[in-house]
Amino acid sequence: MRRNVYLWLIAVAASLLMACEKGNQGPVGPDPSTIVDGMPKSAKRGVAFSFTNMLDLPLLSPYISWDYNWGNTPTDDAALWFDSNEMDYCPMCWNGNYNADKIRAFVAAHPNTQYLLAFNEPNLTDQAHMTPREAAALWQPLVDLAKELNLKLVSPAMNYGTLPGYSDPIKWLDEFFALPEVDPNDIYAISIHCYMSSASAVQGYIERFEKYGKPIWLTEFCAWDPVPGSVSTQMDYMCTVLHDLETRPSVERYAWFIPRSGSKVDSPPYMQLITHDYPPALTDLGRIYCLLSPMNSKLWLRANRPVYASEYCALKNNALSLRPTTDEEVRNRIGKDGLQVANFSQGQELTYRLYLQEKASTVELRYCGYSNSICEVLVDGQTACHVEMPRTGGSDNWTAAHQALSMDAGAHTITLRLFSGSCSLSAFQVK
Protein backbone atom coordinates (compact mmCIF):
# COMPACT_ATOMS: atom_id res chain seq x y z
CA MET A 1 0.00 0.00 0.00
CA ARG A 2 2.77 2.42 1.00
CA ARG A 3 4.61 1.54 -2.23
CA ASN A 4 1.51 2.45 -4.30
CA VAL A 5 1.16 5.78 -2.52
CA TYR A 6 4.83 6.48 -3.08
CA LEU A 7 4.55 5.74 -6.82
CA TRP A 8 1.44 7.94 -7.05
CA LEU A 9 3.29 10.85 -5.43
CA ILE A 10 6.15 10.46 -7.90
CA ALA A 11 3.71 10.53 -10.83
CA VAL A 12 1.99 13.67 -9.51
CA ALA A 13 5.33 15.42 -9.01
CA ALA A 14 6.42 14.51 -12.53
CA SER A 15 3.21 15.85 -14.06
CA LEU A 16 3.55 19.10 -12.12
CA LEU A 17 7.13 19.48 -13.32
CA MET A 18 6.05 18.95 -16.94
CA ALA A 19 3.28 21.53 -16.52
CA CYS A 20 5.79 24.06 -15.21
CA GLU A 21 8.11 23.40 -18.12
CA LYS A 22 5.21 23.92 -20.53
CA GLY A 23 4.30 27.14 -18.77
CA ASN A 24 7.80 28.48 -19.31
CA GLN A 25 7.35 28.14 -23.07
CA GLY A 26 4.92 31.08 -23.21
CA PRO A 27 1.28 31.88 -22.53
CA VAL A 28 -1.33 29.24 -23.07
CA GLY A 29 -3.60 30.56 -25.78
CA PRO A 30 -5.51 29.85 -28.95
CA ASP A 31 -4.49 27.59 -31.80
CA PRO A 32 -1.22 29.06 -33.15
CA SER A 33 -2.65 28.98 -36.66
CA THR A 34 -5.20 31.62 -35.60
CA ILE A 35 -2.50 34.11 -34.51
CA VAL A 36 -1.54 36.41 -37.40
CA ASP A 37 0.61 39.47 -38.05
CA GLY A 38 -2.08 40.98 -40.30
CA MET A 39 -5.61 40.07 -41.26
CA PRO A 40 -6.05 38.11 -44.52
CA LYS A 41 -8.08 39.60 -47.33
CA SER A 42 -11.86 39.31 -47.21
CA ALA A 43 -13.28 36.20 -48.88
CA LYS A 44 -16.32 38.30 -49.83
CA ARG A 45 -14.62 41.26 -51.48
CA GLY A 46 -14.25 41.46 -55.27
CA VAL A 47 -14.58 43.73 -58.28
CA ALA A 48 -16.57 43.87 -61.50
CA PHE A 49 -13.81 44.67 -63.98
CA SER A 50 -11.98 43.50 -67.07
CA PHE A 51 -8.28 43.42 -66.23
CA THR A 52 -6.78 44.35 -69.59
CA ASN A 53 -3.92 46.35 -68.05
CA MET A 54 -1.73 43.91 -66.13
CA LEU A 55 -0.35 46.76 -64.01
CA ASP A 56 -3.74 46.98 -62.31
CA LEU A 57 -3.62 43.45 -60.92
CA PRO A 58 -0.78 43.87 -58.38
CA LEU A 59 -2.66 46.85 -56.94
CA LEU A 60 -5.89 44.99 -56.20
CA SER A 61 -5.10 41.27 -56.00
CA PRO A 62 -3.53 41.38 -52.50
CA TYR A 63 -6.86 42.65 -51.17
CA ILE A 64 -9.68 41.11 -53.23
CA SER A 65 -10.72 37.49 -53.62
CA TRP A 66 -12.67 37.37 -56.86
CA ASP A 67 -13.50 39.04 -60.15
CA TYR A 68 -15.87 38.83 -63.08
CA ASN A 69 -15.88 40.87 -66.29
CA TRP A 70 -19.38 40.18 -67.73
CA GLY A 71 -17.70 37.80 -70.20
CA ASN A 72 -17.11 34.09 -70.66
CA THR A 73 -13.38 34.31 -69.88
CA PRO A 74 -10.70 36.76 -68.72
CA THR A 75 -7.55 37.49 -70.70
CA ASP A 76 -4.96 34.70 -70.59
CA ASP A 77 -2.52 36.84 -68.59
CA ALA A 78 -5.19 37.80 -66.07
CA ALA A 79 -6.24 34.16 -65.67
CA LEU A 80 -2.68 33.13 -64.82
CA TRP A 81 -2.41 35.99 -62.32
CA PHE A 82 -5.68 34.97 -60.66
CA ASP A 83 -4.45 31.39 -60.25
CA SER A 84 -1.21 32.43 -58.55
CA ASN A 85 -2.71 35.13 -56.31
CA GLU A 86 -5.68 33.41 -54.67
CA MET A 87 -8.29 35.12 -56.83
CA ASP A 88 -11.36 33.42 -58.22
CA TYR A 89 -12.66 34.34 -61.67
CA CYS A 90 -16.36 33.76 -62.38
CA PRO A 91 -17.44 33.22 -66.02
CA MET A 92 -20.71 34.89 -66.98
CA CYS A 93 -23.37 34.17 -69.59
CA TRP A 94 -24.44 37.80 -70.13
CA ASN A 95 -27.41 36.77 -72.28
CA GLY A 96 -28.28 33.80 -74.46
CA ASN A 97 -25.37 34.42 -76.84
CA TYR A 98 -22.60 32.90 -74.75
CA ASN A 99 -19.86 30.57 -75.98
CA ALA A 100 -20.21 27.33 -74.05
CA ASP A 101 -17.06 25.86 -75.57
CA LYS A 102 -14.96 28.83 -74.40
CA ILE A 103 -16.30 28.34 -70.89
CA ARG A 104 -15.55 24.61 -71.08
CA ALA A 105 -11.99 25.30 -72.20
CA PHE A 106 -11.47 27.87 -69.45
CA VAL A 107 -12.72 25.54 -66.72
CA ALA A 108 -10.56 22.71 -68.07
CA ALA A 109 -7.50 24.97 -67.89
CA HIS A 110 -8.52 26.40 -64.50
CA PRO A 111 -10.17 23.55 -62.58
CA ASN A 112 -10.52 25.65 -59.41
CA THR A 113 -13.32 27.62 -61.09
CA GLN A 114 -16.39 27.32 -58.87
CA TYR A 115 -19.25 29.46 -60.21
CA LEU A 116 -21.16 30.39 -63.34
CA LEU A 117 -23.02 33.70 -63.41
CA ALA A 118 -26.29 33.96 -65.35
CA PHE A 119 -27.91 36.74 -67.39
CA ASN A 120 -27.05 40.39 -66.70
CA GLU A 121 -29.97 42.62 -65.67
CA PRO A 122 -32.64 40.92 -67.80
CA ASN A 123 -35.25 43.47 -66.72
CA LEU A 124 -33.32 46.37 -68.30
CA THR A 125 -33.97 47.11 -71.95
CA ASP A 126 -30.34 48.10 -72.60
CA GLN A 127 -28.94 45.01 -70.91
CA ALA A 128 -29.94 41.32 -71.32
CA HIS A 129 -33.55 42.47 -71.98
CA MET A 130 -35.60 39.34 -71.26
CA THR A 131 -39.00 38.70 -69.77
CA PRO A 132 -39.06 35.87 -67.23
CA ARG A 133 -40.56 33.58 -69.87
CA GLU A 134 -37.89 34.48 -72.44
CA ALA A 135 -35.15 33.83 -69.89
CA ALA A 136 -36.74 30.53 -68.89
CA ALA A 137 -36.70 29.37 -72.52
CA LEU A 138 -32.90 29.76 -72.47
CA TRP A 139 -32.38 28.43 -68.97
CA GLN A 140 -31.99 24.66 -69.25
CA PRO A 141 -28.82 24.73 -71.42
CA LEU A 142 -27.26 26.99 -68.78
CA VAL A 143 -28.22 24.57 -66.02
CA ASP A 144 -26.83 21.66 -68.03
CA LEU A 145 -23.55 23.50 -68.64
CA ALA A 146 -23.14 24.27 -64.93
CA LYS A 147 -23.81 20.64 -63.99
CA GLU A 148 -21.47 19.33 -66.68
CA LEU A 149 -18.63 21.51 -65.38
CA ASN A 150 -19.53 21.03 -61.71
CA LEU A 151 -20.10 24.77 -61.27
CA LYS A 152 -22.52 26.45 -58.89
CA LEU A 153 -25.04 28.50 -60.86
CA VAL A 154 -25.75 32.07 -59.75
CA SER A 155 -29.10 33.64 -60.67
CA PRO A 156 -29.68 36.35 -63.26
CA ALA A 157 -28.31 39.62 -61.87
CA MET A 158 -31.26 41.79 -60.85
CA ASN A 159 -31.64 45.54 -60.55
CA TYR A 160 -34.49 48.01 -60.66
CA GLY A 161 -35.38 47.86 -64.33
CA THR A 162 -36.72 49.59 -67.42
CA LEU A 163 -38.51 46.60 -68.95
CA PRO A 164 -42.25 47.43 -69.01
CA GLY A 165 -44.03 45.64 -66.19
CA TYR A 166 -40.80 44.53 -64.51
CA SER A 167 -39.27 47.58 -62.88
CA ASP A 168 -39.37 45.62 -59.60
CA PRO A 169 -36.67 42.91 -59.67
CA ILE A 170 -38.59 40.83 -57.14
CA LYS A 171 -41.54 40.58 -59.51
CA TRP A 172 -39.25 39.38 -62.31
CA LEU A 173 -37.57 36.76 -60.11
CA ASP A 174 -40.84 35.52 -58.59
CA GLU A 175 -42.30 34.92 -62.05
CA PHE A 176 -39.07 33.34 -63.28
CA PHE A 177 -38.91 30.89 -60.37
CA ALA A 178 -42.57 29.96 -60.85
CA LEU A 179 -42.14 28.84 -64.46
CA PRO A 180 -41.99 25.07 -65.12
CA GLU A 181 -38.68 25.37 -67.00
CA VAL A 182 -36.97 26.72 -63.88
CA ASP A 183 -36.08 24.71 -60.78
CA PRO A 184 -34.97 27.10 -58.00
CA ASN A 185 -32.91 24.24 -56.55
CA ASP A 186 -30.56 24.57 -59.54
CA ILE A 187 -29.63 28.06 -58.38
CA TYR A 188 -26.97 28.40 -55.70
CA ALA A 189 -27.05 32.16 -55.06
CA ILE A 190 -28.99 35.32 -55.91
CA SER A 191 -27.11 38.05 -57.79
CA ILE A 192 -28.23 41.67 -57.38
CA HIS A 193 -27.05 45.16 -58.39
CA CYS A 194 -27.63 48.38 -56.46
CA TYR A 195 -26.71 52.01 -57.11
CA MET A 196 -28.74 53.77 -54.43
CA SER A 197 -26.61 56.34 -52.61
CA SER A 198 -28.18 55.72 -49.21
CA ALA A 199 -26.47 52.99 -47.22
CA SER A 200 -29.71 52.19 -45.40
CA ALA A 201 -31.49 51.88 -48.76
CA VAL A 202 -28.85 49.36 -49.89
CA GLN A 203 -29.39 47.36 -46.71
CA GLY A 204 -33.15 47.38 -47.19
CA TYR A 205 -32.72 46.33 -50.83
CA ILE A 206 -30.58 43.34 -49.82
CA GLU A 207 -33.14 42.30 -47.23
CA ARG A 208 -35.83 42.05 -49.92
CA PHE A 209 -33.91 39.20 -51.55
CA GLU A 210 -33.26 37.30 -48.33
CA LYS A 211 -36.70 35.72 -48.67
CA TYR A 212 -35.29 33.28 -51.25
CA GLY A 213 -33.12 31.65 -48.59
CA LYS A 214 -29.99 31.63 -50.76
CA PRO A 215 -26.61 33.35 -50.46
CA ILE A 216 -26.71 36.87 -51.89
CA TRP A 217 -24.07 38.23 -54.24
CA LEU A 218 -24.05 42.01 -54.67
CA THR A 219 -22.25 41.97 -58.01
CA GLU A 220 -22.42 45.69 -58.88
CA PHE A 221 -22.69 48.59 -56.45
CA CYS A 222 -21.52 52.10 -55.65
CA ALA A 223 -23.25 55.38 -54.76
CA TRP A 224 -24.67 56.76 -58.02
CA ASP A 225 -28.38 57.55 -57.62
CA PRO A 226 -28.42 60.36 -56.71
CA VAL A 227 -24.89 61.20 -57.82
CA PRO A 228 -22.71 61.96 -54.76
CA GLY A 229 -21.40 65.49 -54.54
CA SER A 230 -17.81 64.56 -53.69
CA VAL A 231 -15.40 61.68 -53.31
CA SER A 232 -15.70 62.14 -49.55
CA THR A 233 -19.41 61.27 -49.80
CA GLN A 234 -18.56 58.16 -51.83
CA MET A 235 -15.98 57.20 -49.20
CA ASP A 236 -18.48 57.48 -46.36
CA TYR A 237 -21.00 55.43 -48.34
CA MET A 238 -18.36 52.78 -49.01
CA CYS A 239 -17.37 52.50 -45.35
CA THR A 240 -20.92 52.12 -44.07
CA VAL A 241 -21.99 49.65 -46.76
CA LEU A 242 -18.86 47.49 -46.52
CA HIS A 243 -19.20 47.22 -42.74
CA ASP A 244 -22.72 45.87 -43.30
CA LEU A 245 -21.74 43.53 -46.14
CA GLU A 246 -18.85 42.02 -44.20
CA THR A 247 -21.01 41.24 -41.17
CA ARG A 248 -24.32 40.36 -42.86
CA PRO A 249 -24.62 36.53 -42.89
CA SER A 250 -26.82 36.45 -46.00
CA VAL A 251 -24.20 38.20 -48.16
CA GLU A 252 -21.57 35.79 -49.48
CA ARG A 253 -19.83 38.02 -52.03
CA TYR A 254 -19.81 41.58 -53.30
CA ALA A 255 -18.09 43.38 -56.19
CA TRP A 256 -17.47 47.12 -56.52
CA PHE A 257 -18.38 48.89 -59.75
CA ILE A 258 -15.86 49.88 -61.03
CA PRO A 259 -12.09 50.04 -60.43
CA ARG A 260 -11.54 52.30 -63.45
CA SER A 261 -13.88 53.93 -65.95
CA GLY A 262 -13.37 56.12 -69.01
CA SER A 263 -14.02 59.33 -67.09
CA LYS A 264 -11.59 61.31 -64.96
CA VAL A 265 -10.99 59.99 -61.46
CA ASP A 266 -12.13 63.27 -59.90
CA SER A 267 -15.42 63.38 -61.81
CA PRO A 268 -18.85 62.16 -60.61
CA PRO A 269 -19.75 59.65 -59.31
CA TYR A 270 -16.20 59.44 -57.86
CA MET A 271 -16.18 55.63 -57.70
CA GLN A 272 -12.85 54.70 -59.31
CA LEU A 273 -10.35 52.62 -57.33
CA ILE A 274 -7.35 52.98 -59.66
CA THR A 275 -5.79 56.09 -61.22
CA HIS A 276 -5.25 56.68 -64.95
CA ASP A 277 -1.55 57.38 -64.35
CA TYR A 278 1.36 55.36 -65.67
CA PRO A 279 2.14 53.37 -63.71
CA PRO A 280 -1.31 53.29 -62.09
CA ALA A 281 -1.86 53.54 -58.35
CA LEU A 282 -4.73 53.10 -55.95
CA THR A 283 -6.88 56.17 -55.46
CA ASP A 284 -7.71 57.14 -51.88
CA LEU A 285 -11.09 55.47 -52.43
CA GLY A 286 -9.26 52.39 -53.68
CA ARG A 287 -7.08 52.33 -50.57
CA ILE A 288 -10.19 52.35 -48.42
CA TYR A 289 -11.79 49.53 -50.43
CA CYS A 290 -8.64 47.44 -50.16
CA LEU A 291 -7.74 48.13 -46.54
CA LEU A 292 -11.12 48.23 -44.79
CA SER A 293 -11.31 45.48 -42.17
CA PRO A 294 -12.75 42.08 -43.15
CA MET A 295 -14.25 42.06 -39.62
CA ASN A 296 -12.68 38.68 -38.84
CA SER A 297 -13.82 37.40 -35.44
CA LYS A 298 -11.80 34.17 -35.48
CA LEU A 299 -8.20 35.37 -35.78
CA TRP A 300 -5.93 37.11 -33.28
CA LEU A 301 -3.54 39.92 -34.19
CA ARG A 302 -0.06 39.50 -32.78
CA ALA A 303 0.52 42.55 -30.57
CA ASN A 304 4.16 43.11 -31.53
CA ARG A 305 3.49 46.41 -33.31
CA PRO A 306 1.05 49.32 -33.27
CA VAL A 307 -2.41 48.32 -34.46
CA TYR A 308 -4.13 50.53 -37.02
CA ALA A 309 -7.40 51.87 -35.65
CA SER A 310 -9.10 50.31 -38.69
CA GLU A 311 -7.99 46.75 -37.83
CA TYR A 312 -11.05 46.15 -35.65
CA CYS A 313 -13.15 42.99 -35.73
CA ALA A 314 -16.34 44.71 -34.57
CA LEU A 315 -17.76 48.20 -34.10
CA LYS A 316 -20.87 49.66 -32.53
CA ASN A 317 -21.95 51.95 -35.38
CA ASN A 318 -21.37 51.07 -39.06
CA ALA A 319 -21.35 54.77 -40.00
CA LEU A 320 -17.64 55.06 -39.30
CA SER A 321 -15.59 57.25 -41.64
CA LEU A 322 -12.19 55.86 -42.61
CA ARG A 323 -9.48 57.65 -44.56
CA PRO A 324 -5.93 56.76 -45.66
CA THR A 325 -3.72 57.57 -42.71
CA THR A 326 -1.78 60.83 -42.59
CA ASP A 327 0.13 59.71 -39.48
CA GLU A 328 3.56 59.09 -41.00
CA GLU A 329 5.11 58.04 -37.69
CA VAL A 330 2.63 55.20 -37.33
CA ARG A 331 2.98 54.17 -40.96
CA ASN A 332 6.76 53.98 -40.52
CA ARG A 333 6.47 52.00 -37.30
CA ILE A 334 4.02 49.49 -38.77
CA GLY A 335 5.73 49.32 -42.15
CA LYS A 336 2.62 49.18 -44.30
CA ASP A 337 -0.26 51.37 -45.43
CA GLY A 338 -3.38 51.69 -43.30
CA LEU A 339 -6.52 53.66 -42.53
CA GLN A 340 -7.35 56.09 -39.75
CA VAL A 341 -10.72 56.53 -38.11
CA ALA A 342 -11.71 60.07 -39.07
CA ASN A 343 -14.78 60.42 -36.85
CA PHE A 344 -14.12 58.66 -33.55
CA SER A 345 -17.04 60.18 -31.67
CA GLN A 346 -18.64 59.82 -28.26
CA GLY A 347 -20.26 56.41 -27.76
CA GLN A 348 -18.48 54.71 -30.67
CA GLU A 349 -16.83 51.39 -29.81
CA LEU A 350 -14.08 49.61 -31.71
CA THR A 351 -13.16 46.05 -30.73
CA TYR A 352 -9.92 44.21 -31.51
CA ARG A 353 -8.60 40.68 -30.93
CA LEU A 354 -4.97 40.72 -29.79
CA TYR A 355 -2.46 38.11 -28.74
CA LEU A 356 0.24 39.25 -26.31
CA GLN A 357 3.40 37.20 -25.96
CA GLU A 358 4.30 39.11 -22.79
CA LYS A 359 2.44 41.01 -20.11
CA ALA A 360 1.58 44.61 -21.02
CA SER A 361 1.57 47.58 -18.66
CA THR A 362 0.80 50.55 -20.93
CA VAL A 363 -1.60 51.51 -23.69
CA GLU A 364 -0.67 54.18 -26.23
CA LEU A 365 -3.25 55.92 -28.45
CA ARG A 366 -2.22 57.91 -31.54
CA TYR A 367 -4.79 60.64 -32.22
CA CYS A 368 -5.45 64.22 -33.30
CA GLY A 369 -8.40 66.56 -32.91
CA TYR A 370 -9.83 69.93 -32.00
CA SER A 371 -11.53 68.89 -28.74
CA ASN A 372 -10.46 67.26 -25.50
CA SER A 373 -11.43 63.60 -25.45
CA ILE A 374 -11.39 60.64 -23.08
CA CYS A 375 -11.19 57.04 -24.28
CA GLU A 376 -12.28 54.14 -22.10
CA VAL A 377 -10.21 50.99 -22.67
CA LEU A 378 -11.92 47.68 -21.93
CA VAL A 379 -10.01 44.40 -21.73
CA ASP A 380 -12.15 41.28 -22.12
CA GLY A 381 -15.25 43.37 -21.46
CA GLN A 382 -14.00 45.00 -18.25
CA THR A 383 -12.85 48.62 -17.91
CA ALA A 384 -9.06 48.66 -17.64
CA CYS A 385 -8.37 52.41 -17.76
CA HIS A 386 -9.38 55.79 -19.15
CA VAL A 387 -7.00 57.66 -21.46
CA GLU A 388 -7.12 61.46 -21.52
CA MET A 389 -6.47 62.92 -24.97
CA PRO A 390 -6.03 66.73 -24.90
CA ARG A 391 -6.87 68.53 -28.12
CA THR A 392 -4.00 68.83 -30.60
CA GLY A 393 -5.30 71.88 -32.47
CA GLY A 394 -5.44 70.34 -35.93
CA SER A 395 -6.70 67.45 -38.01
CA ASP A 396 -3.17 66.26 -38.83
CA ASN A 397 -1.35 67.23 -35.62
CA TRP A 398 -0.80 63.67 -34.45
CA THR A 399 0.38 62.91 -30.94
CA ALA A 400 0.36 60.05 -28.46
CA ALA A 401 -1.49 59.62 -25.17
CA HIS A 402 -0.41 56.96 -22.67
CA GLN A 403 -2.04 55.29 -19.69
CA ALA A 404 -1.05 52.47 -17.38
CA LEU A 405 -3.01 49.22 -17.51
CA SER A 406 -2.40 45.57 -16.69
CA MET A 407 -2.81 42.84 -19.30
CA ASP A 408 -1.53 39.31 -18.88
CA ALA A 409 0.10 37.50 -21.77
CA GLY A 410 -2.32 35.60 -23.99
CA ALA A 411 -5.39 36.28 -26.10
CA HIS A 412 -7.62 39.25 -25.26
CA THR A 413 -10.35 41.38 -26.74
CA ILE A 414 -9.72 45.10 -26.41
CA THR A 415 -12.47 47.65 -26.89
CA LEU A 416 -11.83 51.36 -27.34
CA ARG A 417 -14.94 53.31 -26.33
CA LEU A 418 -14.86 57.08 -26.68
CA PHE A 419 -16.20 58.29 -23.36
CA SER A 420 -16.32 61.98 -24.31
CA GLY A 421 -15.25 64.36 -27.06
CA SER A 422 -14.34 63.49 -30.65
CA CYS A 423 -11.10 62.94 -32.54
CA SER A 424 -9.33 61.08 -35.31
CA LEU A 425 -7.61 57.87 -34.27
CA SER A 426 -4.74 56.40 -36.28
CA ALA A 427 -3.47 53.54 -34.12
CA PHE A 428 -2.94 52.13 -30.65
CA GLN A 429 -0.46 49.81 -28.98
CA VAL A 430 -0.31 47.82 -25.75
CA LYS A 431 3.19 47.15 -24.48
Q: How should these model regions be labeled?
A:
Residues 16-39:
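Bacterial Sec-dependent N-terminal signal peptides
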Residues 69, 91, 120, 170-208, ...:
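Aromatic- and acid-rich polysaccharide-binding/catalytic face
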Residues 44-114:
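N-terminal carbohydrate-binding/catalytic regions of secreted carbohydrate-active enzymes
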Residues 297-431:
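Extracytoplasmic
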Residues 161-164, 211-238, 257-275:
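Active-site clefts of carbohydrate-active enzymes
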Residues 1-18:
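Sec-dependent bacterial lipoprotein signal peptides
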Residues 90, 248, 257-306:
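Aromatic-rich peripheral "rim/lid" segments of glycoside hydrolase catalytic domains that contact
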